Amino acid sequence: MGRDTIADIITSIRNVDMNRKGTVRIESTNMAEKIVKILLREGFIENVRKHQENKKSFLVLTLRHRRNRKGPSP
């Protein structure tokens, strides 16, 4: 059984957004970078930076603040 990278990325972003957090960190892969580039261009993400920790690369995404979103209060 393989991993569904696209679903994992979207789910991570959705979970962080629903919990009203500002940033999410995902593993940096070629596919993840391409997906994030599209989300950035479409306005779902405000900023992206690459972070390296213990020889592993991550993408740190700053989510765009949305009004009237449902989810738990801070």
UniProtKB/Swiss-Prot annotation:
Q: Which GO terms describe its cellular component?
A: chloroplast; ribonucleoprotein complex; ribosome
Keyword list, A-Z: Chloroplast, Plastid, Ribonucleoprotein, Ribosomal protein, RNA-binding, rRNA-binding
Main location group: plastid
A molecular function (GO) term? rRNA binding
Q: Which domain of life is it from?
A: Eukaryota
Q: Name one GO biological process term.
A: translation
Q: Does the keyword Nucleotide-binding apply?
A: no
> Carries keyword Ribonucleoprotein?
yes
InterPro entries the record matches: Ribosomal_uS8, Ribosomal_uS8_sf
Q: Report the locations given in the UniProt record.
A: Plastid, Chloroplast
Q: Name one Pfam family in it.
A: Ribosomal_S8
Q: What does this protein do?
A: One of the primary rRNA binding proteins, it binds directly to 16S rRNA central domain where it helps coordinate assembly of the platform of the 30S subunit.
Could you say which protein family the record assigns here? Belongs to the universal ribosomal protein uS8 family.
Cite the record's note on assembly.
Answer: Part of the 30S ribosomal subunit.
- Protein name according to UniProt: Small ribosomal subunit protein uS8c
Q: Which organism is it from?
A: Oenothera ammophila (Evening primerose)
Q: Identify the gene encoding this protein.
A: rps8
